[in-house]
Amino acid sequence: MNIQIEVLGEVTCVRLEGRLDFGAATGFQQSIERLFAGKPPPPAVIIDGSRLEYVASAGLRAFLLAAKAAQRAGSAFALCALQPAVREVFDLSGFSQIMSIHPDLDTARARVRAPHK
């Protein structure tokens, strides 16, 4: 899996490409931990799933840990542009009920607001 991180103003975009399976979940989780370990942490993080082909249960766990890390840091957290198969996994697992998911990056950027500490 390929992970690219880009700062777009106050929003940090994490672009995922490939398969977020058991082997890739650890690398994704470590990237997110490094991101939130920065001082100061980013005000908002959006995970762009437009090129994410597959997510396993270990990947869902990594998303949950990322959302919790964002909450601890006082950062907004959202996902966008999930492929239909990936979105179905989020829907069936109930993750779409607990995470902010937007149809595209522009919509996510417009709706994400950093929570006040």
Map each language-model feature to its residues:
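A charged, well-structured terminal subsegment
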Residues: S100-K117
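Amphipathic alpha-helical interaction surfaces in cytosolic regulatory modules
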Residues: F22-M99
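General small-molecule cofactor/ligand-binding pocket signal
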Residues: Q4-E6, C80, H102
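Short beta-strand/loop segment at the start of cytosolic alpha/beta domains
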Residues: M1-R15
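Conserved catalytic submotifs in the C-terminal HATPase_c
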Residues: L8-G9, S50, L82, D106
